[in-house]
Every structure is written in C-alpha cells, then in structure tokens.
Regions:
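Interfacial helix-cap and linker-helix signal at transmembrane-aqueous boundaries
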Residues: 37-38, 69-70, 150-159, 242-243, ...
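A late C-terminal transmembrane helix in Major Facilitator Superfamily
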Residues: 334-369, 376
Length: 397
C-alpha cells in the first residue's frame, strides 16, 4: 500500500513538473513575438499592456476561485480543463484577424493559466517541502526558456509569430489529455496515518473574509505583486530594449532574452539542492540584492556584452525568490490563513504582471527604452524593502 502511494506521488510530481513547463512557455513567447504582433495589427508599443491586462483579468479570476473549484471538481479535472482552455486561447491568437479579438482571447488563456498555477502551488505547498517547490518552479523556468527559443525559430525560419503560438498551444492540449488520463490519481485521497497527523494547509477551513482582514496577508500579497511584476517586465521588455537602443540583431537578441530564462532555470535547480540548508530568508534577501545589482548594471551598460551579463545575473539572482516566498507563506501569515493567502498571492501576481510591465511600456514610449533598467532597479529595491519589513514583522509577532 505504501509503495502504491509512493508511486502515485512520484507520478503526480512528474506531471506537476510537466505542467509548469507548459505553463511557462506562453510567458516566454510574448516578449519576442511582440514587435511582430504590433506591426501585424498596427498598434502602438504600449498596447501590450492591454493584452497583459486581459490575461490578468482571467488569471486573477481563476486563481482567486481555485480553492472552491478544486473542492467541487477535483484537482485533476480543474487542471485538465485549464490546460485545454489555455491551449484554446493561444490557438485563437493565431486565427483572429483583428486586435480586439486577440485581447478577448487573452482572458481565456489567463483563466486557464491562473487555475493551473494556483492549484499546483497549493498542492505542492501542502504536500511537499521547500526543495521540491524550487524544483517545481525550475520546470516553469524550462518552459519560459523554451518559449523565446521556439518563437525565435518561428520568426527566423518562416517569419511567423503565429507558428510559435501554435506549437505551444499543441503542448497545452497534450497536457490536458495527460490530466484527463490521470484523473483518478489526482482525486484519490491519502489514507490517514493517525489522529495526531499534522494538519495540511488545505485542512484549515478559514473563511476568506477573516483572511482578508489580516494586514500581514496583504503585505504578503504585495511581495508577489512587486516580484512577478519585475520578473515579467524583464522577460517582456529585454528583447525590445536590445533591438531598439542597444543595436543587437533580432536573432541574437532572441537568444540573449532566452539567457535570462536559462539562468533563471539554473538558479532554481541550484536552489532546490541548497534551499533547506540556506533557508528562505537568505535565499530571498541574497536574490534581491543580486537583482538590484544586475538591474543597475543593465542601466549602466559600460560595454555591449554587459547587457547579456546583466540579464543573466538578474535571472540567476531572482530564480529562488518566488518559490521561497510561496513556501514561506505559512510562516508569514500563519497556517490558518495560508491556503487562502496563496490564492490571493496568485491573484496579486496576475495584477503585477499586467500593471508593472504595462506602466514601464508607457514610460518607455514617452521617453526612451533606456528607462526600462531604471524602472527595474526601483522595483527590485522596493521589493527588498518590503520583504525586510515582513521579516521584522515576523520577529515582533
């Protein structure tokens, strides 16, 4: 019986890894595809904020409601439906003739992504440790690394951003089929090992209203808003910065943009090995200091290769931050509020993904692309300050 349970857990972990690879792929596509998309639809540079906002609307809605959805449908059913929804949205991007229809499909893709993200994060935070959380998010990094590469190949060979989205859409549909075939495994309950077994985060039934009244919950959500906003901003705007003002060719810029996600992935793999030994606070604080230095180097740009060095440094530095913050949710807000807070944090990531890159796009349009690294430095420095505030609050609690 124990062997069967162990095999089931291993299978679910592998599927979770694959799901996060697929989840990361679309996030890596947009930054490289955007110059071609805006020319195709004759729209301004900062119109990307509209698409991001639409995606976030869907993402925030499904992530906030992920708890009730999983309780009613089961984890496997939610994941299967969500992957199919994401695949449909991405495929739709390639078929619509006008911009506003692509924006509407952004909501569809966001609905799918939000439920996958929140559901898997809650499941892993409840059942596994910090090391596995880092490895899970490393698989997301693999997906985001593959995204720019797939899109660069599509643009270089057939000059078609639509091909890149169709390839990634196919991955989403295949994954949806995998979840359908393993529904029984996801929905199976573990047998209780005794009345003194520690409660999992999902065992607490704290009302959402009570959770929302906790100031520390909102402070925790702010961390995710700032972090994911900065992470997605660099992924979204690196390519445009390199080809716009740094004189880098599109093919090389695509590879450099991919280097951000590559070092990002390597960083999470390394963190997965050392996470337990180093501890959450050191991972987060060290990563944020490295990110501030990397963003400053990107802005300084003393020689051409420094852009590549800066992007790679930021990717490696911020790699462990998101999973470490996710694993530390219970420590920051208390176990009673952790499950609800995770859903709120995932909603905050969606909001940050739309607001911060969109604002940076507005600033870049009104001034210069060179304002991008300045904005990143400010956001990372603010995030470091907010995190230190939460650490001090924990110490006083």
């Amino acid at each position: 019986m124990n062997t069967l349970r162990k095999n089931r857990k291993i299978s679910l972990v592998i599927l979770a890894y694959i799901a996060f690879i697929a989840l990361g792929m679309p996030d890596g596509l947009l930054g490289v595809a955007w110059p071609s998309i805006r020319i195709n639809f004759s729209i301004p540079l900062d119109a990307i904020g509209i698409l991001l906002a639409a995606s976030v609307l869907g993402y925030m809605t499904s992530s906030f409601l992920s708890g009730p959805l999983i309780a009613r449908m089961g984890v496997g059913s939610v994941l299967a439906a969500s992957c199919a929804l994401t695949g449909a949205g991405l495929l739709g991007y390639t078929l619509v003739p006008v911009w506003w229809m692509m924006v509407l499909l952004g909501i569809v893709a966001g609905l799918g992504a939000g439920a996958i993200d929140a559901g898997l994060n809650t499941y892993v935070a409840s059942h596994f440790g910090e090391g596995l959380m880092q490895w899970l998010h490393a698989s997301y990094g693999i997906g985001v690394t593959l995204g720019p590469i797939i899109m660069t190949i599509a643009l270089s060979t057939l000059n078609s951003w639509r091909l890149g989205y169709r390839v990634v859409s196919g991955f989403q549909f295949v994954l949806a089929a995998c979840f359908l075939l393993t529904l029984a495994m996801w929905n199976q309950k573990d047998a209780s090992t005794g009345s003194d077994e520690p409660k999992r985060l999902t065992d607490y039934k704290t009302p959402m209203g009570e959770t929302l009244r906790q100031p520390r919950v909102w402070l925790s959500a702010l961390l995710f808003f700032l972090y994911v906003g900065a992470e997605s901003s660099l992924g979204t705007w690196t390519y445009s910065l390199l080809i716009g003002t740094r004189g880098i060719s599109p093919a090389v810029a695509g590879l450099w943009a991919g280097s951000y996600w590559a070092t990002f992935t390597v960083g999470r793999m390394v963190a997965g090995v050392f996470a337990k030994r180093v501890g959450i606070n050191r991972l987060v604080q060290g990563g944020l200091v490295g990110a501030v230095l990397g963003a400053a180097l990107l802005g300084w740009n003393p020689f051409q290769a420094s852009s590549l060095l800066a992007v790679a440094l930021i990717g490696f530095a911020i790699a462990p931050i998101f999973p470490a913050l996710m694993s530390g949710t219970s420590q920051r807000v208390g176990p009673h509020f952790a499950a609800n807070t995770i859903g709120l944090q995932m909603a905050a990531t969606g909001f940050g993904t739309a607001v911060i890159p969109g604002l940076i796009g507005v600033f870049a349009r009104r001034s210069s692309m060179e304002i991008i690294p300045i904005c990143l430095t400010v956001v990372f420095a603010t995030l470091l300050g907010v995190y230190l505030l939460t650490v001090n609050s924990e110490a006083k609690a």
